[in-house]
């Protein structure tokens, strides 16, 4: 039985998830990675847990935004030290060398905080790896220095204090990383499963019940295609889908390495670099950026944003004023789609409802592939996981680590035969998507001989071709220059066909 095999292979990395009836966790509104971490902490070997214990832990260590004033009172007025789980970002002031931090979920900004040097030396390795880091923070208070006074004598000879200000200080920090991600072990464990079993395991890892798909492999694989930007650097995708297919959940609640922006206003400063604050934008600190409900997003300056996006999507480099930066975040455009557009299966103008910034072929050409979200069933109870599954936090950490593994691209480069005069962007798009599929479905592959030609073609190359082909067809609708230009006929290197 696959449950037994899964538990034998992954042991500590498996938790019992039952999203069908776990209204308890739904009420807590926790992201998947946090929920699974708590489950692992409190579940017994049979997957049972004490709801009262969990509720007490959540109340103590997972405060809500409305609890922030109470926390401030305990720290600043009562002079207590308070511990809780939070997302932390650090800032180093160049002029003074002072290090401060922010808690974005609670509105605590850099100007009101301090990380003293001895604390910084202890926890800097955990805090500087990402723009934002989840962990257990311990907060204290550094009172104003009573002896640091300056006096301003006015006509009334009043004096004002202008010395050190009281600040909330970071007393300690323990990163939220409950597992050591042994990539080699994960890769080798894949050898124990068939491709069908592995597809079902991947679905369970991101909270879906494979049996709910009724054995429809295409629906399963289309759902898993959403994970490609999690596992491959700078993979840019467009997905249009009906409402209720779980786009927001998968991109926004499963992994702590991505960012979901749903509606509202997006600026170049927020996305890339803020010149006034001298701070990096979203692309610098995340594995992927998802612009969800993209039809409802407005851009502060369309031309400015389009130029910045074109440069970044092409090379991973962005320039804002005199600042040049590089990043590895992929870009995903998500939107809802009308039934008549779905019925055309990609052969009508699907981009007409996107914001004007995307009404340019040169920009759309930089998106590698298209996900036909109408092939994903609308969310229902049968699709919710109910059984033993890979811990979401562990699996997302594995995908994050696999982004840096270049050996898969080397296999793809060797196995794919590129035809003469092939369009450079088509070639890169197909190779990048095929590499992501290889990492996701066949992480055990270390060289071309480790995968059959049939499986590589079926699960990696052919799927990559189809995803790019939809982009190419849409380009022909947007711009006459692209009409009639099909993607090149990429094949398997004859050395491996034999």
PLM region descriptions:
Residues 197-215, 404-421:
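Short amphipathic alpha-helical segments and their helix-coil junctions
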Residues 60, 363-364, 368-498:
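Conserved NTP phosphate-binding and transfer environment spanning the P-loop NTPase/kinase superfamily
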Residues 211-343, 347-349, 365, 488-493:
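Conserved ASCE/P-loop NTPase catalytic core
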Residues 1-209:
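Extended, charged/polar low-complexity intrinsically disordered regions
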Residues 325, 330-334, 350-380:
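Long, well-ordered mid-to-C-terminal structural blocks that present hydrophobic/aromatic surfaces
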Residues 339-357, 381-389:
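Conserved P-loop NTPase catalytic core
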